[in-house]
Amino acid sequence: MAMTAREAAWTALQRWRKNGAWSDAALHAVLQNAQLEPRDAALAARICYGTLQNLTLLDHYLSVYCTTPLQKLEPKVLDLLRLSAYQIVLLDKIPPRAAVNEAVALCRKGGCARASGLVNAVLRRVAEHRDALPEIPGAGTADYLAVRYSHPRWLAQRYIDAHGYAFAEQALAANNADAPACLQVNTLKTTADALMASLHADGIEAEPHPWLPDALLCHGGNLADARAFADGWFYVQDA
């Protein structure tokens, strides 16, 4: 059976955790073997990077709804809970039911079938409360910022001490915001200039990467709907 976008993201997260690989290297290695359609590859990348960006926040929510302490879960089960909670809480376009159902299916397929009941129960609770998630304690403190923006507490405190709480929150929020998409040109099929022209024709802002050759930075627009995406003219990478 072909690998799905969520399965690719889960596999990449496990590779990242086990091998200490950079997230882009872990994902690239998985996507090379998965042979996903461009739209699914983009979804896998979004889930993988988004989960890693929000680990502390996701763990906060999961710990509320999971009766087993997170540190006692099998690591790959925790990986699956995290990426599924990310989809439910932070990705508006994915129906929560779809995220829950595929997580259970992946749990069974991925060699941790005994945890499928726990995965189902925890994610259903997250989905039921997605519009009223538990508050993060410590409002107005470094503890709050560390959880809300998934940054080390010491960094949040340093920003507060140096510039005040408002600046600290703005800085951490900006650092955790989605960066422009970095596209690696598939030079076997096109050139950077031709790709940029094609993206512009589809209403997607793009510009040459300041230091990477044969790469573009994209701001806004739906890359999955671009003609160049369907034609395999580029790969999304972390840069």
Predicted regions and their residues:
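Class I Rossmann-like S-adenosyl-L-methionine
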Residues: 1-228
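Conserved SAM-binding loop and adjacent beta-strand
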Residues: 230-239
